């Protein structure tokens, strides 16, 4: 009995299991010869090639998790200060993610917390530069008048150097000021007016004439200081014997005229 000679097609069937390459795979069971097994680590997942992070990538969430202990103002609790993670965060936290790879390491909450931090006195840290003084107040508590109020006060002062209480009340109501503010403004303005008179004595006579005419029209008496500076006869306005004998007796206690000459002298000497 003769067997047929095997053809060339039968040879590959025998050679496939003999010459097929077998891939080198890590054994499934742990062995004591691999470094990962010695260190007790499992098979690590393949790490992708590092690329530049984008705002939409998962790198943002990774940065926020490592950035929290770095920029948080609360220090690390002493019980966890010896932990290696705390030392790692302190060593690599500020510079690891604050470089050019991620130019915006802080979120809005970080800057908001910085603005709301408080100093030991209990005031906000960045609050003092934004404090503004009231516009109508100066340093020292002096009142700053508006331009319209100053113009009206100057007009009134040109025609009348002294105000009676009813006139002062009416002027204060018109300018929306208090009577004390109007009185103080006139005192300071008279002190400035006297200082200018001393610097320019030639205008004393003209000012005295103008004040005398105004006083005669309004039925008011001039203060004693203006009488001493002007060479005029008091009998032109009111020829009373009391005023000719004693110029200081013209201002009675019952008069409505405001008497603040001493206060003006004190302000002038202080200035």
Curated annotation (Swiss-Prot):
Modification sites for Phosphoserine: 54
User: Where is it localised?
Assistant: Nucleus; Nucleus, Nuclear body; Cytoplasm
**Which ranges does the entry annotate as DNA-binding region?**
138-197
Q: Does the keyword Lyase apply?
A: no
Task: Please provide the record's keywords in A-Z order.
Answer: Cytoplasm, Developmental protein, Differentiation, DNA-binding, Homeobox, Nucleus, Phosphoprotein, Repressor, Transcription, Transcription regulation, Wnt signaling pathway
GO biological process, alphabetically ordered: animal organ morphogenesis; anterior/posterior pattern specification; B cell differentiation; common bile duct development; embryonic heart tube development; embryonic organ development; endoderm development; forebrain development
Domain of life, per UniProt, equals: Eukaryota
GO MF terms held by the record: chromatin binding; DNA-binding transcription activator activity, RNA polymerase II-specific; DNA-binding transcription factor activity; DNA-binding transcription repressor activity, RNA polymerase II-specific; HMG box domain binding; RNA polymerase II transcription regulatory region sequence-specific DNA binding; sequence-specific DNA binding
Its biological purpose: Recognizes the DNA sequence 5'-ATTAA-3'. Transcriptional repressor. Activator of WNT-mediated transcription in conjunction with CTNNB1. Establishes anterior identity at two levels; acts early to enhance canonical WNT-signaling by repressing expression of TLE4, and acts later to inhibit NODAL-signaling by directly targeting NODAL. Inhibits EIF4E-mediated mRNA nuclear export. May play a role in hematopoietic differentiation.
Organism name? Mus musculus (Mouse)
Q: Where is this region: Interaction with SOX13?
A: 1-138
List the GO cellular component terms. Answer: cytoplasm; nuclear body; nucleus
Biased amino acid composition, Polar residues? 212-242
Cite the residue spans of the region called Disordered. Answer: 195-271
Q: Does the keyword Protease apply?
A: no
Region of interest called Required for WNT signaling induction, as start-end residue ranges on this chain: 138-271
What Pfam families has UniProt attached to this entry? Homeodomain
The Acidic residues compositionally biased stretches are 245-261
Q: What interactions and quaternary structure are annotated?
A: Interacts with CD81; the interaction prevents nuclear translocation of HHEX. Interacts (via N-terminus) with SOX13; abolishes the SOX13-mediated inhibition of WNT-mediated transcriptional activity via competitive inhibition of the SOX13-TCF7 complex. Interacts with EIF4E; the interaction inhibits EIF4E-mediated mRNA nuclear export.
Name the SUPFAM superfamilies for this protein.
Answer: Homeodomain-like
Question: This protein is called what?
Answer: Hematopoietically-expressed homeobox protein Hhex
